[in-house]
């Protein structure tokens, strides 16, 4: 079962929840990065938060290049989860606590995301662990949310370690268990990691990436 219907519904509920609760769209600090998501005027020199809406991509993002580079077939949901929309990261409440789902802010962000997924998959190969790819974070314990590439199930994973707990048998069922979390935008601190400079790859993931690299 594709995750796309569940993602469509969650993103639609997300901006509707902000409108009904706060009377405004969700806001995000783009840090000078343009996006089709931005509603209203955008000044690249400004450090102010912008209002945004998820936008369906005209040309769907593909991970065929990642599959070719790693000689690996990726679970099809990766193309639906990351390739259908331009959007800011989205916050959620869930049975497993609060967290954040990554999304793609613009085409450059998509390129950076692909490089980070390649890095993650290469690390899994080096550690002789089953392939996973990340979709977000749980706030408690800085734990990644990952998809098992063999069967599409969703797990909690600490970088460098085996996934520790299955959260849902599929990405669709995981997303269906989430509800939008209403919160003010947070301006993420940029860490000196060139491959992770795009704001769509959130600061908390960068901290975990440092931990992962330290275990090489």
Curated annotation (Swiss-Prot):
GO cellular component: cytoplasmic side of plasma membrane
Membrane topology: Peripheral membrane protein
Keyword Zinc-finger: no
Subcellular location: Cell inner membrane
Keywords, in A-Z order: Cell inner membrane, Cell membrane, Membrane
Family statement drawn from the similarity comment of this UniProt entry: Belongs to the Syd family.
Protein name according to UniProt: Protein Syd
């Amino acid at each position: 079962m594709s995750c796309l219907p569940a993602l469509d519904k969650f993103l639609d509920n997300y901006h509707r929840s902000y409108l009904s609760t706060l009377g405004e769209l969700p806001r995000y600090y783009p840090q000078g990065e343009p996006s089709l998501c931005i509603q209203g005027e955008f000044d690249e020199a400004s450090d102010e938060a912008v209002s945004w809406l998820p936008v369906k991509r005209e040309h769907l993002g593909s991970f065929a290049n990642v599959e070719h580079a790693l000689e690996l077939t990726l679970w099809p949901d990766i193309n639906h989860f990351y390739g259908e929309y331009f959007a800011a990261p989205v916050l959620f409440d869930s049975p497993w606590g609060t967290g954040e789902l990554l999304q793609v802010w613009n085409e450059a962000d998509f390129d950076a995301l692909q490089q980070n997924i390649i890095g993650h998959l290469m690390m899994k190969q080096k550690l002789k662990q089953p392939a996973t790819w990340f979709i977000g974070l749980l706030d408690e314990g800085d734990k990644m949310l990952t998809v098992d590439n063999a069967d599409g199930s969703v797990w909690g994973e600490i970088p460098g370690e085996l996934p520790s707990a299955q959260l849902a048998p599929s990405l669709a069922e995981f997303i269906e268990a989430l509800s939008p979390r209403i919160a003010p935008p947070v301006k993420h601190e940029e860490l000196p990691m060139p491959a992770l400079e795009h704001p769509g790859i959130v600061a908390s993931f960068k901290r975990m990436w440092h931990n992962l690299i330290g275990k090489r």
